[in-house]
Amino acid sequence: MSRLNEIGFDFENDLLVAVGDLVDRGIQNIECVDLLNEDWFTSVRGNHEDLCIQGIDDQAARNCHISNGGEWFYNELSPGDQERMVEQFKELPIALEVNHNGKKYGFVHGHIEQNDWNEFARNEGVSVFRDPAQLAMWGRERLNSDNLQYTHVKGIDAVIMGHTVTEKPFKRDNCYYIDTGAVHWATLTILDLETV
């Protein structure tokens, strides 16, 4: 909250959109999830929220979750609290569109396979070979690849993503990567859409 106060965040009029991974990134897991109850806050679903959802019923997902910071979920929460949190996470969108000052911004946690936002939005969750919803939470290909198949994403002014830690905020085409390692180096990036 101190970072929001530093930048002059207006809790009455501004909206903070998180790019997922509200949990498993430090010791304030519950406090971060509680932000979902605030009118000024929303988030897309990240792979760590997905691990909570999957880990309830799938031992392999649970093991993966535990080895990636999720032990608190199984050790500190009652089964009822786990279920309530999972229900909150199921409500989080895989992708979110925000209109601001005549521009359209897209938010996903990890990756967008398509170079067209509208195609991505229509096909989210339906793919013969690569599930766009899973890629949106787990993928890194657009950032970690010099593959020429990934270009400017049409139909949206900017796509904002997290998931892959970069030393500083990074832009490729109209995609912004803003995970600067808050979990590792306490460097929290807040991107003001006025500057995009």
Q: Each predicted region: which residue ranges?
A:
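N-terminal active-site segment of His-dependent metallophosphoesterases
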Residues: 1-34
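Catalytic phosphate/metal-binding cores of nucleic-acid and nucleotide-processing enzymes, i.e., regions
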Residues: 10, 16, 60-61, 77-80, ...
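Active-site neighborhood of phospho(di)ester-bond hydrolases with catalytic His/Asp-centered motifs
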Residues: 16-20, 43-46, 107-108, 157-164, ...
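Short, solvent-exposed loop/turn segments at secondary-structure junctions
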Residues: 24, 49-50, 111-114, 165-167, ...
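Active-site neighborhood of divalent metal-dependent phosphoester bond hydrolases
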Residues: 29-98, 102-103, 125-139
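Short, well-ordered beta-strand micro-motif
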Residues: 97-99, 107-109, 190-194
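Divalent-metal (often Zn2+) His-rich catalytic cores of metallo-beta-lactamase-fold enzymes
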Residues: 104-127
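Conserved beta-sheet core of the metallophosphoesterase superfamily
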Residues: 139-196
